[in-house]
Each structure stands twice: as C-alpha cells, then as structure tokens.
C-alpha cells in the first residue's frame, strides 16, 4: 500500500489570479513580462498620517483586465463577505473553470477538496466593525461579521459553490500560507485522501489598520511615496522595505492518472515540497538563512533532485534590507557552484507583497514561466547590494528553456519551498 501511495503523481490542471496587475491569468502574465507595475498611490482611504502611502492594489472597474466584484458574487452576497473571501472565490472560480473539472457523481465530489488560506483574513471587516461597535454599540454589529472574517470560510465558500465534499481545510502561516496550501493539498493527493484539490492563498490587508501595523513594525517602504512603481526593489542597495499588496492565486491540483484519463490540460507537475522553521525571531529571519536553507534542502530531497537540476527560482525577495541578502546567501550556500547557472527573480517588484497570497501567486508565475519559456524580471534592480551576484534577471523578462523551477516563500520563523517541473 505504501509503495502505491508514494507513486501517486500530482499535476496542475487549472490556475486563477487576482492581482494588482489585473484580474485573470492572461492579463496579469502579459503585464508582468512587459515589466509593468501594479504598485500605486493609495486613494481608497486616508493615508495622510501613514508613513507609507503606496500599495499593490487590484484595479477595480469594468474595463478589460479589471476586477469587477459583480462578476463573481451578487451585490447582496458581497456585503456578507470580506474582500479576501471575494478575491479567493474569484481566483478559485477561474482555476476550476480553467481545469474543466465538473464532478457529477457523489464519489467524484467526495474526492474533490479545497485548501485555501490567508495570512491575516478579514482585517478590513474587523477594523470596520470595531468602529461601528465603538460609535453605535454592540447591537449594530452585523450577524455576518464573524463568517465574513474567518479564514477557513474561503475554502467553505468555494466548496459550497461547486459542491466539493472532499477534504476542506485552511492554512494560516503568514507569508508562507499560499505555498503551504499547495504543498499540503498535494500531499493529500499523494496520500490518496483526494484526487483533486483546489488550493492557494488570498489576502486583502490593504486598509488603514493593516498599513499602520506594518508601518509601526518599520517593515514598509517609505522613501518612494511619490514614485510608487520604484518602491519594490529586491536586492537593490536602495531598498527600504516591502510594499504591501492584495490579491489571490488558486490552483487546481490533480492526481496524474485522473487528469490523464479525462484528457485534462496539464500545466506542470508538482515534484517537491520542503518546510522548516529557523526558531529565531517572530519577524526577522536567522542571519545565516538556516530556515531557508533547510526548506530548500528538504524540497530537493522530496523531489529526489540535486541543486544542479534547478533552472530558475522565484524568490521570496520582499525588498527588505535584511531579508533579501539572507535569502540570496542561503541559495548560494546550498547550490554551491550550481548557483552560477540559476536565474532568480522576484515578482514582488511588480505587484508588491501579497502576504498570504504570495506563495500561490508566485507558484502560478513559475508555472507560466515553464509554459511560456519566459522568466519574469526583477524590476528596479539598478545597483545590486554587495555580494548579490547571481543572475537576478534585472529589468527585462528573459527567454529560456527550463524544466525544473522553484517557488519560494518565507516568513521569519516559517519557511516553505515548492518544486515544480514540466510534466514528463
């Protein structure tokens, strides 16, 4: 039995995106490889007393490529959920439609699960409801407040929408959330707990309290408020903090034979997953990058690969003064001489840091790099920090022919690494 379980392969058959570059996979990808930026000045709420006044914000409207909430939920339903749930539903709906998976019989529905997480959840709803309660009293609190804010209800809403009655789960691991969701969902398929899993991350923390909290921790960029598109600059010596972003990335994962039998389109194969914790600090990574090193090593071991097998790394690369160099050095330490042939870029330079949605969004970017033979660039990398001498794909996307690619996500004490490859 153990041998048969270990041989279950996991592939990606559907993808969906809602990002600061637009709503939908195609529009987001095209803008990404054309080195466009989704980071702009915040105009949705008052930022006059905030030190950071910029964010990666989803374009909302009816024009092509914009996010229109009415496309995904009725107005009444929109009022019953926080935006992070709305974004998650939108990305999941895209992914499910893209996969073509529409189970009709109970057995197939029971073998289809959902695992979507968020780093923070309904922060805007919590903030708004706190104000209402303070100003108008407890009786004015909406009965939808709690279900609108709970992180697990992204998975719940998606399951209800499609009547998926398999494993229903959620992940809350800060910036590693989206990557953990994919890895954990893949393991459910590998272990035969499910045949299909809808997995990913979503986040909507661009609000006054979210901005104020990260600013108080001195985590955000503050030197580029007048030129927001220049603010996220991973590995550049002038970086001064990350740019918060919002959005969702969701994938449909499927057991290989199951996908093959129904003639599904296969984007990539999930080949490895590694986790670690550096047991160091709640917000700062260990100076020697030990957590990232172990997570990468574990992912390679899981995939039965060597560092020399890896062609491209989509890095965590948040644009923080401390984290970027630590991650870079951890990669070089593990890869040794193989680091000279690896390309590594950070797509946060285009969309900001999507927190709980970062890992899944960047996993999708990695898959699209495999599919299209194009590595997305690191924007604003004008003067690399001393020692940052890997190929960091500055400014322009690069045409490649790669087979094994890696998506990274890190959050201080938490580390998660995914390995993706072309389906053989």
Region spans (language model):
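Active-site-proximal alpha-helical scaffold in enzymes
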Residues: 88-101, 151-154, 159-203, 242-264, ...
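ACP-dependent fatty acid/polyketide chain-elongation machinery
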Residues: 1-77, 257-269, 364-378, 417
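Glycine-/small-residue-rich "gating" segment that lines the acyl/pantetheine channel
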Residues: 135-142, 180-183, 187, 196, ...
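Conserved small-residue
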Residues: 14, 32, 92, 114, ...
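Conserved small/polar residues in nucleotide/adenosyl-binding loops
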Residues: 403-410, 422-424
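Condensing-enzyme catalytic core mediating Claisen C-C bond formation in acyl metabolism
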Residues: 9-13, 40, 227-303, 311-312, ...
């Amino acid at each position: 039995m153990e041998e048969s379980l270990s041989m279950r392969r996991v592939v990606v058959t559907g993808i969906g995106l809602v990002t600061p570059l637009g709503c939908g996979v195609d529009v987001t990808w095209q803008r990404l490889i054309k080195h466009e930026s989704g980071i702009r000045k915040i105009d949705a709420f008052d930022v006059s007393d905030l030190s950071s006044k910029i964010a990666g914000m989803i374009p909302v409207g009816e024009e092509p490529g914009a996010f229109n909430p009415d496309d995904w939920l009725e107005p009444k339903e929109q009022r019953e959920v926080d935006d992070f749930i709305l974004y998650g539903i939108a990305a999941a709906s895209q992914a499910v439609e893209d996969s073509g998976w529409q189970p009709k019989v109970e057995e197939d529905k029971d073998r289809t699960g959902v695992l979507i997480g968020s780093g923070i959840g309904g922060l805007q709803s919590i903030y708004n409801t706190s104000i209402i309660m303070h100003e108008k009293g407890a009786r004015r609190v909406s009965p939808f407040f709690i279900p609108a804010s709970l992180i697990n209800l992204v998975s719940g809403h998606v399951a209800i929408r499609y009547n998926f009655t398999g494993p229903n789960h959620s992940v809350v691991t800060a910036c590693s959330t989206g990557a953990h969701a994919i890895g954990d969902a893949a393991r459910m398929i590998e272990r035969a707990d499910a045949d299909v899993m809808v997995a990913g991350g979503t986040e909507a923390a661009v609000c006054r309290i979210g901005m104020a909290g990260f600013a108080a921790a001195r985590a955000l960029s503050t030197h580029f408020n007048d030129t927001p598109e220049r603010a996220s600059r991973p590995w550049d010596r002038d970086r001064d903090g990350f740019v918060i972003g919002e959005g969702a990335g969701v994938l449909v994962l499927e057991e290989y034979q199951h996908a093959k039998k129904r003639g599904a389109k296969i984007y990539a194969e999930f080949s490895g997953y590694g986790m670690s914790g550096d047991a160091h600090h709640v917000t700062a990574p260990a100076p020697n990058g030990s957590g990232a090193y172990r997570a990468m090593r574990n992912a390679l071991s899981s995939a039965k690969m060597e560092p020399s097998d890896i062609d491209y790394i989509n890095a965590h690369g948040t644009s923080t003064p401390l984290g970027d160099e630590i991650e870079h050095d951890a990669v070089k330490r593990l890869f040794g001489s193989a680091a000279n042939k690896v390309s590594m870029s950070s797509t946060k330079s285009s969309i900001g840091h999507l927190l709980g949605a970062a890992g899944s969004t960047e996993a999708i970017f990695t898959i699209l790099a495999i599919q299209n033979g194009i590595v997305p660039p690191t924007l604003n990398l004008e003067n690399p920090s001393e020692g940052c001498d890997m190929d960091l794909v500055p400014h322009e996307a690069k045409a490649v022919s790669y087979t094994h690619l890696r998506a990274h996500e890190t959050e201080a004490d938490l580390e998660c690494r995914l390995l993706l490859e072309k389906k053989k």
